[in-house]
């Protein structure tokens, strides 16, 4: 795959960033800027039930944007081809920083600040560490690069689920393989 088209605009694919429950994310170029093109897929997922994935992406983006979660700007959406164009956030994932023992304390502080606005809005996000990038340009800003969110459930909040994967522990390593599969290329999202 060399190019993807979104609403008539062509994007040169540079590389696969990652595969998640809902789609493949590609680093791409439109001749002016580097962006992310996400192609929705319909592959089965044992642990998650989907409705209309494209509508869920758009609805979740709107919900998180209103709550004020730092995330990549949605640039374009091609509903018929099930593709999104998102701002590219250059930097390391929390997953990469945990493995390198370079995760700054301010990342934990920032995800907790996200929780302070998410929980009162009855919302959880996917706290898996591949979904968070510390921006290279401004190393003090953490972004949630997925748009997925769900109604709040205590068992799936950061403290009870996500935090287990934000440290180098057997739980994190088991979780990485249990959720993503051993052959996964963990980059920007799992």
Language-model segments: what does each one mean?
Residues 115-123:
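Protein kinase catalytic-loop region centered on the HRD/HxD motif
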């Amino acid at each position: 795959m060399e190019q993807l088209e979104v609403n008539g605009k062509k994007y040169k694919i540079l590389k696969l960033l990652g595969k998640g429950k809902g789609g493949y994310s590609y680093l791409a170029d439109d001749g002016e800027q580097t962006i992310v093109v996400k192609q929705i897929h319909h592959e089965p997922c044992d642990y998650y039930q989907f409705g209309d994935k494209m509508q869920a992406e758009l609805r979740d983006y709107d919900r998180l944007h209103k709550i004020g979660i730092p995330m990549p700007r949605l640039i374009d959406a091609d509903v018929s081809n099930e593709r999104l164009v998102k701002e590219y956030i250059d930097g390391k994932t929390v997953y990469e920083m945990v493995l390198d023992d370079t995760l700054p304390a301010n990342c934990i502080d920032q995800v907790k600040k996200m929780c302070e606005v998410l929980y009162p809005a009855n919302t959880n996000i996917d706290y898996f560490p591949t979904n968070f990038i510390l921006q290279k340009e401004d190393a003090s800003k953490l972004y949630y690069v997925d748009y997925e969110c769900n109604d709040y459930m205590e068992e799936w909040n950061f403290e009870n689920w996500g935090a287990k994967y934000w440290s180098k522990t057997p739980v994190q390593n088991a979780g990485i393989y249990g959720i993503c599969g051993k052959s996964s290329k963990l980059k920007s999202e799992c």
